[in-house]
Amino acid sequence: MLRTIFLLSAFLLNGIAFSQPGVFIRFTSANTMFPDTARANGHDYSGKHYDALTHYNDSSVLIYVPKNFSPKGSPNLIFWFHGWSNNIDTAYRQYELVSQFEASGRNAILVFPEGPKDAPDSYGGKLEQPAVFQALAKDVVQQLENRKILRRRRSFNINDYDITLAGHSGAYRVISRILNKTPVHEVILFDAMYGGNEYYLEWLSNPEHRFVNIYTKNGGTFDNSRQIAKLITDSLNVPVISVDEPAVNAQLLQSNRKVFIFSEQTHNGVITYHNNWALFLRNTPAR
C-alpha cells in the first residue's frame, strides 16, 4: 500500500525548511529500485560493507509540481536518478534541482525515485526489470490524479505521457536499462556516460530522440562520451553536435537533438554551473 505525505510550499522536510512555490508529494511505492533481492545482503565496495537495511530499503518517491504547471496535452514526467553516495533529499538540495526546475519554466512534473541510498553503487534494482518502470509511472500518475493535479483517465497507458529520464554520475545504469523498455523521448546526462553503450546506441538511433550529455575531463566519462558521439555519426548516421561548454546557448540547444558538451567544471559542478539543468530543460527542439 502506498503511504503518502502531502507537502505544500513553505514545508518542513528532514528538519530543514524550504519555501518553493510549487507542490511536493512524498510517497512510497513497491515499484521503486529497492528493496531488491540482489541487494538483500547489502553490497561491498572498496573494502566496506553497505548493509541492506540502511542503504537498500528505502522505497520513497518525491514529486515536485511547479507553480505554473498546466495539465494540457501529454503531461511531461521527468524522472531524476541520483548518483553515488547520495539520496533523493541530499541530491535535490546539493544540485539545486528543484529551484532550477522551477526557474526553467518547463511545463512538467519532476519525479525523484530513491536509489542506492548513500552508497557507491550504480545498480538500478527492480527498475532494471522490464515492466517495473511503467508500474512506477502508474503509481506517480495515481498520486497526481488523487490530488487533481492530473485529470483522471479511465485506465493508465504510458503512451499518454511524455517521459524524460535524467541523472548524474552512476545514474547511467538505471537509465540505460529503462530507455528501450518504455517510450522515452528525452535523456539528459550529467557526467554519467560510463557505460551501457549498447542500450544508449539503440535508443540514440532514433533521430527524434533528444539527448544531452555533458561530460568532464576527470569524471571518468571523457573517452566514452567521445566514442559514443563518433559512433552516432559514423555507425548510426544520426546528426550530432559536439561542443565545448562556452559555446552552449539557447539557439544551439533548440536546434540540435543530439548534443555532447565538454565541460571544464568538476564532476559535481556541471549541474549547477550557469544553471545548466535549467538551461537544458528550458531550451528544447521543436517537436
Please provide the spans of the model-predicted regions.
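Sec-dependent N-terminal signal peptides
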Residues: 4-13
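A domain-start/cap signature at the N-terminus of enzymes
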Residues: 19-77, 108, 239-248, 256
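Active-site machinery of serine-nucleophile hydrolases
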Residues: 74-77, 81-144
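Alpha-helical scaffolding within the catalytic cores
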Residues: 92-101, 194-205, 245-247
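Active-site nucleophile loop of the alpha/beta-hydrolase fold
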Residues: 115, 188-196, 216-220
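Gly/Ser-rich "nucleophile elbow"/oxyanion-hole loop immediately N-terminal to the catalytic nucleophile
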Residues: 125-169
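Primarily recognizes the serine-hydrolase "nucleophile elbow" in alpha/beta-hydrolase
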Residues: 158-206
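C-terminal catalytic histidine-bearing segment of alpha/beta-hydrolase fold enzymes
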Residues: 216-287
